[in-house]
Amino acid sequence: MQTAVSDFINAFASSCSDLLTRALRKRVVLQVEEMSSVPASDLSDTVLTAPAAVVKGPGCTIAVVLERQLAFSVLDTLLGGDGKTAVENRPFSDVEQAVAASFMEKLADCLNSIWRWGSDKDLVPDKMAEYFSESGFSAGKEMVFLAVLNVSWDKNWRKMYICIPDSDLDVLEGELKNAFDADGNVTLSVEMGSSSLDAGEARQLGIGDVVCVAPPEGGLMVRAGKKAFCLAQSGAVGDSVAASILCRYEGQDTGTPAVAALLGTAKRPWKEVLNLDTGDLLVLDRTRMSPVPLMVAGQLKAEGQVIVIDKRLGVRIKKLL
């Protein structure tokens, strides 16, 4: 069994190296080294063991964890930082844990798919690379991908490092830094108005409360994360609602409004979003005027009904999510 697992790891490592070298056009630094027998519980000081991606295979378990320094670097990058956060002697925050859980879940899904696929097929590098590219980490994924894979069987550990250099593509330094998901898509929110409430007031909102929202000058605001990209006006294309771009911002950081009322959302590849220009139509994937979705601190938290108070647009909260 140890030989079978070793063969699997070597095939997986080879496919990763081949695929990612082609995808990023850079040499992947990959090192496989032996590690003495260490119980998982003894690794807690140096790695992020919870959450972690666990892949169950026949006779062995693959536990995907992040070394502490790399964990802070990856989480800082995913949360909008520069990825240079130093190791800190503090627990990971709830937000960091949630981001790490999502990251690990996607990786675990990919590895599980490969394991199931490879259980009845030859694990040759070309086939592994082909399947790996179709399992959630497609070629062209532009992000810093730093991970440590710990593979255990019968109390023996083998540690594989996969450390990919920063992509030479400029997305990590561009306007959409960290705004895209694992598939390279950006969720754009089309706001019909935002409130002047501060964060503390927004957290106290409940059912029945009315939030007055002021529409931005010129139309609707199209936003990706904290970045405002353009003002738009709504219209229709067939049976779909669309936003027509009136003018374009250069991804200026406007901050996240405490409360924003949405006309709808659209998920688009980040390259397409970067190319949006005046006069373009952005067809919305989801539109809903009744009830109106309310974003609180950048997250969908409530739904409400549009009302008018003294000629001002407002939303009465009907449901908390």
Predicted regions, residues:
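N-terminal auxiliary interaction/assembly segments of multi-subunit proteins
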Residues: M1-L321
